[in-house]
C-alpha cells in the first residue's frame, strides 16, 4: 500500500530517480575526499614511502611486510617473564589506498548508468532534452559539489579520452556501419569531410586572425598560425555528439549517413591540420617545401590509417576460421584486433579513427560467417554497452572538467568564434551542396541542407585537442579552451535541443523502422544486376560496375581464404535467408511463443536416445563419358530447341520481339493445319467438276431457278438436332425405306427400270467443255434416274447453301 500510494503523496516514478541520484552521490563520498581520477603512485611506491601498515584480510596477493622488532605486535596479556608482548589479531581493517583507483572508476561508471536509468524513467525530460545535455548538467553538478567541499575535481585527461573512451564508440559505429548507404554516398561524404573541414578551418582561422588584430590588447599577440590551429580544432564535426543526438531524433538514412560519415572521415583532416600547425608554430620561417610535405602528409595519414585497419581486419577474419572448437574466445579476437589497429595507427601518428572503421568494415562479413550466432550476439551487445558507457562518461567528465579547468574569458574572441563557426558551416554546406547536386541523381533539398548544416555539432574531440596544447608554445591556450567549451555547449544544448522540433516542423522524412525481408533482398540484388548490365551496355562504368567486379573477386578468391568450410561457397541470398531465419527464431524465443517447440529436457533426452552422428555428404554417382553423351543426345532430340541469343548488343543484329515471333509461328502452324485438312476433305469428296463459290451458286440459282428445281420429290434426310454437323446422325436405312414407299405408288415398270439403273451404279462422265463466256453448269442427262441425279448433284455442289425444299445445310465433320 505504501508503494502504490507513494510517500507523502508523491508517486514512486518521481521518487525513484531522486533515490538513484542520492545513492550515486553517497557512493561518491570517498571520491570527494580524494583527487578524482588522477592515478595515484604505484602500490610499491606507496608502501615504501608510508610507514608499515596493518595487513588487511583482503590483501592476500601481496608479499608480507618485513617484520622488525619495532613492528611486532605486543601481547599485553602475557607476563614479562621470557616472552615479548604482542598486539591482538586484527579482525577488521580498512585500506582505501589499495583499492582507490578501481573503486573510483567503478563509482563513476555506476553513476553514469544510474543517470541513464533516471533519465529514461522520466519520459517528459528525455523527450525534450537530449541525453547528452542531461549528462553534461550532471557533470557540472558533480564538479561543483566536489569543488564546493574544497577538493580538486577530476579532469578529463586527453590520453584517457583518446586511448580508452573514444575507441569503443568508433568501433561500434564502424562495425555496424550501414555499408550500402555509406558506399553509395561516399563521394558526397568525402567532399563534406575533406573540402568542408578545410573550408571551415581556414575560413574561421583567417577571420579570427582579423578579429585579433582589431580586438584589443588581450588578443593582439595571437598570430596567424595560432588562429589556424584553433580553427582546425574547432572546425571538425564530432562523431560522439552526432551519434548522441541523431540516434534520438530517428532521422532518415540519407541525412544520418551524410552527417555521421562526415564526422568519421574528417578525423584525418583534423589530425593533419593539428600536427601541421602545431609544428609550424615552432618554425621561424615556413617554406614551400614545408607546405608541400604537409599536403602530402594528409594522404599518408588517411591512406595509412585505412591500410592498417584493412591489415588487422584481414588477420582477424583469418583467425576466426580456426575458432570452431573454442567458441568462447571468438568475440575477444574482434575487440583485440580492432584495438590493436587503433593503437598501431596512433603509434605512427596515423588516423586511428580511420583504422578502426576500416578494420570493422573489413572483418565483419567474414567473422560473422565463421563465428557462432551466440558469439555474434555477444559482440553486438558488448559493443553497444561499451560504447554507451564511454559516451556517458565523456559527457559527464566534460561537465566536470568545465568546472575544474582554468578559463580565460574574452567577450570579443568567444562571441566571434561562435558566430563565425555558424557562418562557416552554413556557407560551406550551401556551396558544396550546389556543386554536389550537379552530379547526384537524388538531389539534396533545401530541407536536407538545413539539417546537414544544423547538425554540425562539436564535442569532446575538440575539447581534448584543445587541452593537449602546450602552454609554453601557446600562451593563450586557456582562452582557446574557453571558446571551445562555449561552442560545444551551444551546439549540444541549443542545436541539440531544437533539432527535433525543427525536424517535425519541416516535416523531414524520418527513419522507417521496418524489418528487412527476403523479398526485398531479392529485388535489391535484381536491381543491382540490372543496373550493372545497363552500365555495360551504355559503356559507362559507374559504381554498380565496380561493385559487381569487387563481388566477383571476393567470391572467387577472398572468401575461399577467409571463410571456413562450405560457407564460402554459399550464395549471398541463401546466407541472408539463414540469417533471417535465425533472427526470427530468436525473436520467437524472446516473445515467449515457443509452446509447440520441444522443451530443453525433451531435446536433450532425444539427443541421448539418438546420438548425433556426423553429417554425411551426399555423393552423386560419377557418369561415364558415353553415358553422358547419350543423355545429351536424348535431351537434344526430345527437348524443344531454344532460340539463339546474341552475346552482345549490336544495332545491326536486333531480333524481333519474342512474343510477336511466337504468335506469328502459331498463326502459320494453324494456317498449315487448315490447308492440310481442306486438302484431305477435297480428296475424299472427289468433286466431278470445278467447285463454285457460294456466291456464284446463289447467283446461278437466282438467274435460272427452273433448271435446278427438282422434278420429283426428294428423299428427306433425318438429322440429329443434338449434333447437326455429325455424319453419323444421317439415317440411311430410313432414307432407303422412304424411297421404296414412294416407289410403290408409281408404275412398276418405271420402278424396275430405276432399280436396274441403281444396280448399275454411278457412272462418272467427263464434262463437256463449255463455250467461252459461259459458266460450268451441271445439266442432268435425260437417261439418268432421279437417284443418280441427286447423288451427282450432291457430289458436284457440296456448298453450304440449301436447295429449295431442303432443311438446314449439312456440314461434314471438321469443316
Swiss-Prot record:
Residue numbers spanned by region Confers pH-dependent PI(4,5)P2 binding? 540-545
Q: What is the effect of changing residue 305 to R?
A: In LIKNS; causes reduced expression of the mutant protein; hypoglycosylated; does not localize properly at the plasma membrane; small residual activity
Q: For the modification Phosphothreonine, which residues carry it? A: 603, 779
Outcome, altering residue 156 to C: Almost complete loss of activity
Tell me which residues are marked as the site Channel pore-lining. Answer: 161
- Effect after changing residue 226 to A: Does not affect membrane localization. Does not affect sodium:proton antiporter activity
Consequence the record notes for mutating residue 522 to Q:
Reduces interaction with CHP1 and the exchange activity
Q: What is the effect of changing residue 164 to C?
A: Almost complete loss of activity
Annotated region Interaction with CHP2: where?
A: 515-545
UniProt feature, compositional bias: Polar residues: 782-791
For this UniProt entry, which segments traverse the membrane? 99-121, 131-148, 159-176, 187-215, 223-249, 253-283, 288-322, 329-341, 351-371, 374-404, 411-438, 445-469, 476-505
Protein name, please? Sodium/hydrogen exchanger 1
Organism of origin: Homo sapiens (Human)
Source taxonomy lineage? Eukaryota, Metazoa, Chordata, Craniata, Vertebrata
Amino acid at each position: 500500500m505504501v508503494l502504490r500510494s507513494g510517500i507523502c503523496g508523491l508517486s514512486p516514478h518521481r521518487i525513484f530517480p531522486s533515490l538513484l541520484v542520492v545513492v550515486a552521490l553517497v557512493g561518491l563520498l570517498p571520491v570527494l575526499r580524494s583527487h578524482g581520477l588522477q592515478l595515484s603512485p604505484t602500490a610499491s611506491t606507496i608502501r615504501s614511502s608510508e610507514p608499515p601498515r596493518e595487513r588487511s584480510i583482503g590483501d592476500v596477493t601481496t608479499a608480507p611486510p618485513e617484520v622488525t622488532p619495532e613492528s611486532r605486535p605486543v601481547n599485553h596479556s602475557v607476563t614479562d617473564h621470557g616472552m615479548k608482548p604482542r598486539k591482538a589479531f586484527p579482525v577488521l581493517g580498512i585500506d582505501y589506498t589499495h583499492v582507490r583507483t578501481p573503486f573510483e572508476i567503478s563509482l563513476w561508471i555506476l553513476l553514469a548508468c544510474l543517470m541513464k536509468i533516471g533519465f529514461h524513467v522520466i519520459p517528459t525530460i528525455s523527450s525534450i532534452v537530449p541525453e547528452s545535455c542531461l549528462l553534461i548538467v550532471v557533470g557540472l553538478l558533480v564538479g561543483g559539489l566536489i569543488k564546493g567541499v574544497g577538493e580538486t575535481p577530476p579532469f578529463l585527461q586527453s590520453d584517457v579520452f583518446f586511448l580508452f573512451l573514444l575507441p569503443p564508440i568508433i568501433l561500434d559505429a564502424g562495425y555496424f556501419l550501414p555499408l550500402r548507404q555509406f558506399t553509395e554516398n561516399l563521394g558526397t561524404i568525402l567532399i563534406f569531410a575533406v573540402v568542408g573541414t578545410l573550408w571551415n578551418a581556414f575560413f574561421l582561422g583567417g577571420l579570427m586572425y582579423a578579429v585579433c588584430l582589431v580586438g584589443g590588447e588581450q588578443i593582439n599577440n595571437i598570430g596567424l598560425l595560432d588562429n589556424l590551429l584553433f580553427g582546425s580544432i574547432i572546425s571538425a564535426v564530432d562523431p560522439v555528439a552526432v551519434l548522441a543526438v541523431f540516434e534520438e531524433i530517428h532521422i532518415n538514412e540519407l541525412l544520418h549517413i551524410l552527417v555521421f560519415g562526415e564526422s568519421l572521415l574528417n578525423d584525418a583532416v583534423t589530425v593533419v591540420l593539428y600536427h601541421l600547425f602545431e609544428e609550424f608554430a615552432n618554425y621561424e620561417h615556413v617554406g614551400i617545401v614545408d607546405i608541400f610535405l604537409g599536403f602530402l602528409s594528409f594522404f599518408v595519414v588517411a591512406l595509412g590509417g585505412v591500410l592498417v585497419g584493412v591489415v588487422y581486419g584481414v588477420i582477424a577474419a583469418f583467425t576466426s576460421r580456426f575458432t570452431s572448437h573454442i567458441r568462447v574466445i571468438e568475440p575477444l579476437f574482434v575487440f583485440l584486433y580492432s584495438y590493436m589497429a587503433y593503437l598501431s595507427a596512433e603509434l605512427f601518428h596515423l588516423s586511428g579513427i580511420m583504422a578502426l572503421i576500416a578494420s570493422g568494415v573489413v572483418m565483419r562479413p567474414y567473422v560473422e560467417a565463421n563465428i557462432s550466432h551466440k558469439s555474434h550476439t555477444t559482440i553486438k551487445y558488448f559493443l553497444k554497452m561499451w560504447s554507451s558507457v564511454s559516451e556517458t562518461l565523456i559527457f559527464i567528465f566534460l561537465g566536470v572538467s568545465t568546472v575544474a579547468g582554468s578559463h580565460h574569458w574574452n567577450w570579443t574572441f568567444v562571441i566571434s568564434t561562435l558566430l563565425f563557426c555558424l557562418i562557416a558551416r552554413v556557407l560551406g554546406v550551401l556551396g558544396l551542396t550546389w556543386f554536389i547536386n550537379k552530379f547526384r541523381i537524388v538531389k539534396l533539398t533545401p530541407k536536407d541542407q538545413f539539417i546537414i548544416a544544423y547538425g554540425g555539432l562539436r564535442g569532446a574531440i575538440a575539447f581534448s585537442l584543445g587541452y593537449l596544447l602546450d602552454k609554453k608554445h601557446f600562451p593563450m591556450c586557456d582562452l582557446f579552451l574557453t571558446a571551445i567549451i562555449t561552442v560545444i555547449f551551444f551546439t549540444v544544448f541549443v542545436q541539440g535541443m531544437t533539432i527535433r522540433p525543427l525536424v517535425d516542423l519541416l516535416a523531414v522524412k524520418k527513419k522507417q523502422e521496418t524489418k528487412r525481408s527476403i523479398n526485398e533482398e531479392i529485388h535489391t540484388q535484381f536491381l543491382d544486376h540490372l543496373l550493372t548490365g545497363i552500365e555495360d551496355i551504355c559503356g559507362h562504368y559507374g559504381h554498380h560496375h565496380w561493385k559487381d567486379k569487387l563481388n566477383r573477386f571476393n567470391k572467387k578468391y577472398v572468401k575461399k581464404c577467409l571463410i571456413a568450410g562450405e560457407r564460402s561457397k554459399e550464395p549471398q541470398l541463401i546466407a541472408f535467408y539463414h540469417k533471417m531465419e535465425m533472427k526470427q527464431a530468436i525473436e520467437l524465443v524472446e516473445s515467449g511463443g515457443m509452446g509447440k517447440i520441444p522443451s530443453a529436457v525433451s531435446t536433450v533426452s532425444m539427443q541421448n536416445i539418438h546420438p548425433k552422428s556426423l553429417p554425411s555428404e551426399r555423393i552423386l554417382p560419377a557418369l561415364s563419358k558415353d553415358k553422358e553423351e547419350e543423355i545429351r543426345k536424348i535431351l537434344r532430340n526430345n527437348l524443344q530447341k531454344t532460340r539463339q541469343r546474341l552475346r552482345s548488343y549490336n544495332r545491326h543484329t536486333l531480333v524481333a520481339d519474342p512474343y510477336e515471333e511466337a504468335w506469328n509461328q502459331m498463326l502459320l502452324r494453324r494456317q498449315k493445319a487448315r490447308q492440310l485438312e481442306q486438302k484431305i476433305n477435297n480428296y475424299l469428296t472427289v468433286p466431278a467438276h470445278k467447285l463454285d463459290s457460294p456466291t456464284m451458286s446463289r447467283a446461278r440459282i437466282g438467274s435460272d431457278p427452273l433448271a435446278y428445281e427438282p422434278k420429283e420429290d426428294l428423299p428427306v434426310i433425318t438429322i440429329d438436332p443434338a449434333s447437326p454437323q455429325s455424319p453419323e446422325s444421317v439415317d440411311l436405312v430410313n432414307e432407303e425405306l422412304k424411297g421404296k414407299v414412294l416407289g410403290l405408288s408409281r408404275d412398276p415398270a418405271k420402278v424396275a427400270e430405276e432399280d436396274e439403273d441403281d444396280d448399275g451404279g454411278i457412272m462418272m462422265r467427263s464434262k463437256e467443255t463449255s463455250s467461252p463466256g459461259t459458266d460450268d453448269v451441271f445439266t442432268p442427262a435425260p437417261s439418268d434416274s432421279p437417284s443418280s441425279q441427286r447423288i451427282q448433284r450432291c457430289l458436284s455442289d457440296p456448298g453450304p447453301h440449301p436447295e429449295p425444299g431442303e432443311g438446314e445445310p449439312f456440314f461434314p465433320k471438321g469443316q
